[in-house]
Amino acid sequence: MEQSSLKFIRNFCIVAHVDHGKSTLADRLLEMTGTVQMRDMRSQLLDSNPIERERGITIKLAPVRMTYRMNNVQGTMYNENQNEIIHSSLYILNLIDTPGHVDFNYEVSRSLAACEGAVLVVDATQGVQAQTLANLNLARKQNLTIIPVINKIDLPNAQIAKVIGELSSLGFRKEEIIAISAKNGTNVDQVLEAIVSVVPAPNGSTSSPLRALIFSSQYDPHKGVVCYVRVVDGSIIAGPAVSISPQIHPQGDPGFGAPRARVTRLQFIASGVEVDPIEVGYFMPKMLKSRGLETGEVGYIATGLKDVALAKVGDTITAQSSVFSSRFSDKSLSVGQLTGKQKTEKQISDNREQKTDNRVIPLPGYKEPKPMVFLGLFPIESDKVSEVRDALGKLRLSDSAFSYKPISSLALGHGFHCGFLGLLHAEVVQERLSREFGLNLLATAPTVEYKIKIKNQR
């Protein structure tokens, strides 16, 4: 991808208080951009976990790649971020839908780190709420461009003028506030136009060594650890040297179809482990295999790793060699020399310092969340302890906000002391352990940490 092609990418997330209409707005965006056919549409499409759909809340962040053609611009214009907006150009919109409940706020903070913009949704009947302010502050700390949106204007008890006043008091101009009905699709096209016109394009370097931020992950029995990544610099190509069709890039960049060297090995900077990617691709919203991920794009990397501890959220992925280029710089280099044996087992290098001394600076990671509620989980069957340990490790891969450590009780035997961000978080984790891993667990009463102040040294 040429550096100029970055101007056609927008990375943004939707944030709001719980039940203010984030998922409904995401549904309308998917529908209006043609990402999902009408026959396949259903409410809360990005909430793929059955628990999310049953409870009516978003628990885990969900990325999706959309395309949108800007037709309401005549000629060429520039926005306040000096983005060049071109008439009839096709833009790649990478959306990350986020939870609204405070117990899953860590998911929001990880999403924001992968974006340049945020759509802040406020319910017209409720106005600004606690998580509205919390998410707004998180977005501002990340220096994101924020698009204020008032949702549910179709309801008879909507107080649009009042909510506009509340948003104005938070520093937004009245003319930039968009009033919509995500349910009916009213004015949602204005949100799409604002995303293209207001949110800045990624500012990564296509010629720099590969740097990709892991903002989430999951475990697949066949593909191993699947990392959700935002490519900040450089590019990654999976498979042998190929010529990529210009149609993959919306602008048909003539240089985009040039031969590409395979990244024979990727490296996780924090753990030092090296892998050959089994598969890379986009979220459409289901995983769709592609031939590569370019600078500024959001997608996934199937690593083949079976040890979930080696791929941590917040880590930086780079090429094992920092001299990777998307075009062959040495014409004498053969495809055979570029192809390496696929590895699916962990590879901790003995000479890690030498291999990471490639002048690639790791991206800022994430601050570990502090658990607020604690409880013990013990298997009903004492011989299932190892299964519980494996399940907790795999579950933590997709929910890094909870922690666990082994404990032993005279009455209950061996188990795990687990920390959560709240009671709802604890309930969801226990339900996932039961449904996804078939575990029968005994949970102790929830507790919180106490701070003890000793007086007179007694």
Label each residue range with its predicted role.
Residues M1-N72, Y78-P250, G257-S321, V335, ...:
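Structural and coupling elements of P-loop NTPases
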